[in-house]
Amino acid sequence: MTDSTYDVNRVRAYLQGLQMRIADALGAFDGTPLAADTWRRGPGERLRGGGCTRILEAGGFFERAGIGFSDVAGDALPPSANASRPQLAGRGFEALGVSLVLHPRNPYCPTVHMNVRMLIATKPGEAPVFWFGGGMDLTPIYGFEEDARHFHRTCRAALEPFGAELYPRFKKWCDDYFFLKHRNEARGIGGIFFDDFSELGFERSFEMLQSVGDAFLPSYLPIVERRRDTPYGERERAFQAYRRGRYVEFNLVFDRGTLFGLQSGGRTESILLSMPPTAGWRYDWHPDPGTPEARLQSEFLVPRDWA
């Protein structure tokens, strides 16, 4: 979209407030507050700007929980950002957003990812081009239909005020995006995903972004509240490490946010905030038929109409 009528200050204020609200809620749920790490890029670095990382490791519930806010600018969009808009190659940019990944210790509690962001591409003598992106997706280790339906219905409700067609469109986008092509396997049960979005104009597109961000806590906390006291043992933890290995593979090979950060000279600690604290790989391993581990593959890691 080549409309320069946007207000980056309002977007920034919303994102910073969203990070604070989510971090406070997660700290209260865990019983351990998330530490704050404020950072700023130094002179001579490829990017300008800074951000704040809220992080919890080895908490009471979360083995690792990270939620980062960043607002950075650079002289040229990296390839991962203009893959669908080659005409923007070489433009300067500002990118601001909130991204989180939560890794509970209990294998019956799913990993979750959420991101909301805005990018602005600039070129002297031409109107700026802005767009929004984001979404959220759930990655269970053990599948529960009740949880999947709750997550997807909350996502659908967040998008409904902006058009009935958005949820099925963004759900399919999510199913297609969070897919490990080299494994022919989904990362999780999906959710919603969107990028390069400005078709509703700045005001309405920004309202949609806020609705997605605000839906995160009600989409996730009821699920982990239900599962947090489920007993587990070494078998479940071993399968959790195996599934986390798939998470690592996706993030390092396919994830646009990770590639954008690495290609643009971003802050490595923030970029790799999504990595699980432990992960594992087994050679040519397959779960025994009829087990809960096999059921995850056959019933949950396939596209379904959960809502």
From Swiss-Prot:
One of its GO terms (biological process) is protoporphyrinogen IX biosynthetic process. GO terms for molecular function: coproporphyrinogen oxidase activity; metal ion binding; protein homodimerization activity. The record marks 182 as: Important for dimerization. The active site is at residue 113. Its cofactor is a divalent metal cation. It comes from the Bacteria. It is an enzyme of class 1 (oxidoreductase). Pathway: Porphyrin-containing compound metabolism; protoporphyrin-IX biosynthesis; protoporphyrinogen-IX from coproporphyrinogen-III (O2 route): step 1/1. It catalyses: coproporphyrinogen III + O2 + 2 H(+) = protoporphyrinogen IX + 2 CO2 + 2 H2O. HAMAP family: Coprogen_oxidas. Homodimer. Involved in the heme biosynthesis. Catalyzes the aerobic oxidative decarboxylation of propionate groups of rings A and B of coproporphyrinogen-III to yield the vinyl groups in protoporphyrinogen-IX. This is Oxygen-dependent coproporphyrinogen-III oxidase. It comes from Burkholderia mallei (strain ATCC 23344). The lineage of its organism: Bacteria, Pseudomonadati, Pseudomonadota, Betaproteobacteria, Burkholderiales. The gene is hemF.
